[in-house]
Swiss-Prot record:
GO biological process: tRNA pseudouridine synthesis
Organism, as annotated: Methylobacillus flagellatus (strain ATCC 51484 / DSM 6875 / VKM B-1610 / KT)
One term of GO molecular function: tRNA pseudouridine(38-40) synthase activity
Protein name per the record: tRNA pseudouridine synthase A
This enzyme's EC code(s): 5.4.99.12
Subunit structure and binding partners: Homodimer.
Active site: 51
Name of the gene this protein is made from: truA
InterPro entries linked to this entry: PsdUridine_synth_cat_dom_sf (IPR020103), PsdUridine_synth_TruA (IPR001406), PsdUridine_synth_TruA_a/b_dom (IPR020097), PsdUridine_synth_TruA_C (IPR020095), TruA/RsuA/RluB/E/F_N (IPR020094)
Length: 261
């Protein structure tokens, strides 16, 4: 039997998603909890791998098991064995052909940036921070250049293992709620560090160092060395994974609720 799970986690206390020799990754915590409940060793496959410090509101995984449990029992049982920073949101039996990674046709990320003179204390590790005032309109204009199909090499980490830097950006926007800014991205897939590198470039535009067309120039150059530094992982959230309705999964997108009454 193959099961799909929706997962939420706080990445601040983990060495990223992917299993590590020190067993301090989110995947390690989840597999340990599932193995205890299933009574056998469980290995999961995820829709995407997040880096150290990156969070998820809607990660999707699948695994195979012969253990018989109700979907509610899987959720409640696994959550009792997980550390505080990881929770299973839902469980669903799926077709044995379903694959959390390869059947995903798009992924969504949000970046929460607090723009104020002093670094936040309560939200440390949960949001990025920038001390200089940022021009929201300039960043909004710049993000329009990201839409569509592009070679995103200028925003690609050196260690990225993706076969191609060409991706399709379906949505890119930024909104402000008081001192908070939310950068919202949806694409067919993302390169390693792509969102953090795009946010880094947008912040440079927002503080007035470059005009909005700088994004178009970076895309044309296809050279990571021409782009501003990678931004902090603290405010980055995996918020959604898109699947065809034929798989019958529950809602797989959960947005940040900043500024919503």
């Amino acid at each position: 039997m193959r099961l799909a799970l929706g997962i939420e986690y706080d990445g601040a206390g983990f060495c990223g998603w992917q299993s590590q020799p020190n067993r301090l990754a989110v995947q390690d915590a989840l597999e340990s909890a599932l193995s205890q409940l299933a009574g056998h060793q469980v290995r999961v496959s995820a829709a995407g791998r997040t880096d150290t410090g990156v969070h998820a509101l809607s990660q999707v995984v699948h695994f195979d098991t012969e253990a018989v449990r109700s979907q509610t029992a899987w959720v409640r049982g696994v959550n009792t064995k997980l550390p505080r920073g990881v929770r299973v949101l839902w469980a669903k039996e799926v077709d044995p052909r379903f694959h959390a990674r390869f059947d995903a046709y798009q992924r969504s990320y949000q970046y929460w940036l607090i723009n104020q003179p002093v670094a936040p204390a309560v939200m440390a590790g949960k949001a990025g921070w920038f001390h200089q005032p940022l021009d929201l309109q300039a960043m909004q204009e710049a993000m329009a250049y990201l839409l569509g199909q592009h070679d995103f090499s200028a925003f690609r980490a050196a260690e990225c293992q993706a076969k191609s830097p060409v991706k399709t950006m379906h949505h890119a926007s930024v909104s402000a709620f008081g001192s908070s800014m939310i950068f919202d991205f949806c694409a067919s897939a993302f390169l390693h560090h792509q969102v953090r590198n795009m946010v880094g470039a947008l912040v440079y535009i927002g503080k007035g160092k470059y005009p909005p067309v700088f994004i178009a120039e970076l895309l044309e150059k296809r050279d990571r060395r021409c782009s501003p530094p990678t931004f902090s992982p603290d405010g980055l959230y995996l918020t959604g994974v898109g699947y065809d309705g034929c798989w019958g999964l529950p809602g797989t997108e959960r947005k940040l609720q900043i500024g919503i009454a």
